[in-house]
């Protein structure tokens, strides 16, 4: 049996652009793509923290160092520039693989610059004002 588990996430990124007239996908700064271990064409889920929208699309690798997170195509009806989002990839693994796997968590600032890398699914960075879900 295979389980679907979190492969990686880019946490609390700020959407820089949303355009209906682009071919559907999400364009992500190459630095973030590589830090999260994503590849072009990979399926990702996007959760909009600002408005609660959720969607699935695929990754297009954008220019490195830009901080760009661009929502393209029909998804631009759901997610707007300035919205905070979590971009997540998933993978399938056996029980043994799933228990040993450490996801790639990429924490970014308001300009989508990497501020921390980790593998704790529920880590709240010190000073972020966020709470860990482990303490509920």
From Swiss-Prot:
It catalyses: L-aspartate + H(+) = beta-alanine + CO2. This is Aspartate 1-decarboxylase. SUPFAM superfamilies: ADC-like. One of its GO terms (biological process) is pantothenate biosynthetic process. Heterooctamer of four alpha and four beta subunits. Belongs to the PanD family. It comes from the Bacteria. Pfam families: Asp_decarbox. The active site is at 25 (schiff-base intermediate with substrate), 58 (proton donor). The modification Pyruvic acid (Ser) is found at residue 25. CDD domains: Asp_decarbox. Binds 1 pyruvoyl group covalently per subunit. Gene3D superfamilies: 2.40.40.20. Pathway: Cofactor biosynthesis; (R)-pantothenate biosynthesis; beta-alanine from L-aspartate: step 1/1. One of its GO terms (molecular function) is aspartate 1-decarboxylase activity. Is synthesized initially as an inactive proenzyme, which is activated by self-cleavage at a specific serine bond to produce a beta-subunit with a hydroxyl group at its C-terminus and an alpha-subunit with a pyruvoyl group at its N-terminus. The gene is panD. InterPro entries: Asp_de-COase-like_dom_sf, Asp_decarbox. Its cofactor is pyruvate. The lineage of its organism: Bacteria, Bacillati, Actinomycetota, Actinomycetes, Mycobacteriales. It is found in: Cytoplasm.
């Amino acid at each position: 049996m295979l389980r679907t588990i979190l492969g990686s996430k880019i946490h609390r990124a700020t959407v820089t652009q949303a355009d209906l007239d682009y071919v559907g996908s999400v364009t992500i700064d190459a630095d973030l793509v590589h830090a999260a271990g994503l590849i072009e064409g990979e399926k990702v889920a996007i959760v909009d923290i600002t408005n609660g929208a959720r969607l699935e699309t695929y990754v297009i690798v954008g220019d490195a160092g830009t901080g760009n997170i661009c929502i393209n195509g029909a998804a631009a009806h759901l997610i707007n520039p300035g919205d905070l989002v979590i971009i997540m990839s998933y993978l399938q693994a056996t029980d043994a693989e799933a228990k040993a796997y450490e996801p790639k968590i990429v924490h970014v600032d308001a300009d989508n610059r990497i501020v921390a890398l980790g593998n704790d699914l529920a880590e709240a960075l010190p000073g972020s004002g966020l709470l860990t879900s482990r303490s509920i």
